[in-house]
Amino acid sequence: MTFNDILTKLNDFMYTYVLIVLLVGGGVYFTIRTKGVQFRLLMDGIKFMLEKAETDENGKKKVSSFQALMISTASRVGTGNIAGIATALAAGGPGAIFWMWLMALLGGASAFIESTLAQVYKVKENGQFRGGPSYYMEKALGKRWMGVWFSILLIICFAYGFNGLQAYNMSSALEYYIPNYANTNYPMILGIILAAATAFVIWGGVHRIGFISSVIVPVMAVLYILMGLVTMLLNIAELPGIFLMIFQKAFDVQAIAGGFAGSAVVIGIKRGLFSNEAGMGSAPNASASADVAHPVKQGLVQVISVFIDTILICSSTAMMLLVSGVEGQSGVLDGIPFVQKAISANVGEWGIHFITFSIFAFAFSSLIGNYFYAESNILFIKNSKVLLNVFRVTCIAAIFLGAQADFSLVWNLADVTMGFMAIVNIIAIFLLGNVALRVLADYEKQKKQGKNPMFYEDEVGLKGTVWKK
């Protein structure tokens, strides 16, 4: 048995049994404890999302809630929303979509808790806020070793594994256009272009990352959702039957009993968790960068990111595939080729070009969002400019190499590290959940008094944070 085989087995066990229990349990628990905050205060989140960025004493714009939302959505909305959903349908059938939706609805509560905690325990350095699970593990739990372990896992997963995967998916999307693509120089040329473009963005710092994300993500999300709506309108007579099939297959007891690990339940839940990342500890790294008056405001904004990712974008992919009538088979016609063929069946060949363009836009936004997460954690381990620049060079190299080869070992390692990362984060937010609930109570109390909520640490019995009067 090779090391890659061991990683695959560990990955299957972790996602099928351990993470499903922890993340689904966490979603249910926090939904109950917050009284469904992801539904009750959703309109507040939309309002805060649109608040304009303020300027600092030097006249420089601060990171707004919207920019922080776009950075986290950039990371969430990658090729997994296209290729990943196709694979889920091919392997788990239409019923997987229902469980994916349910995970997003429940996961919104976990996303709220972790992002609120990231805001509460963020730090300010060189005029910019940073934070995330590593920071609340150190500042609130007093366990720096736990934060360092989390940071190492996240860096391996996002900076190297997932960014290599995004680059490879962009490269593989060109196979439709260039015969014998893998044996040409085009993968290397694409690798150079992607590496150069990513370098330009990341050396511009958080403001450039936020600006690029806030341009690419909203435009592409709207275009992609519109494409989904057009496809559904062209097949409107079939929609009732498709929705009925999704719900029937979701509760197909015979299929579930026949093989739980490969059932629609497990595949849908795994895809939902993998796509929206709620509770996994990645998005809080972006949440902490926002300059807001109350931590709850950014917690609510991050709920929207989960819904954008799964309820809107993943659902658009699912509907485009299901109405096409094109059959997907794992290993034969799955992932990107499945989507390209399904779209062309609906709207003609131009749909293939649209999917290719979407893959490039979503994947590039993911590259810079993933990098931002990793940078925050490098600085947590050691705040060194030399280390940061060396790290940036290695990230660029991973993207360059990822465009040229299928590094399945690296990606399996990334999946395993993300699993461990999620376990560490879920333990932390369970331990710190009451802090987030006190902060939520403070927000709702001020809101009932007709105030625009402002947060100060002593109001909820905290000390040692940036939230001083």
Language-model segments: residues:
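N-terminal alpha-helical transmembrane segments of multi-pass membrane transport
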Residues: M1-T79, A90-A96, G107, F400, ...
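Transmembrane helix-loop junctions in multi-pass membrane proteins
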Residues: T2-F3, R33-Q38, G80-I85, G161-S171, ...
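Extracellular loop-to-transmembrane helix junctions
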Residues: T8-D44, A90-Q128, I308-S316, I352, ...
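Helix-loop-helix module between adjacent transmembrane segments
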Residues: G26, F30-T31, M103-G127, P133-S134, ...
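Alpha-helical membrane segments and immediately flanking helix-loop junctions
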Residues: E57-L89, L117-V120, E125-S134, E138, ...
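Extracellular/periplasmic helix-exit of transmembrane alpha-helices
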Residues: F112-K122, N126, M227-M245, V253, ...
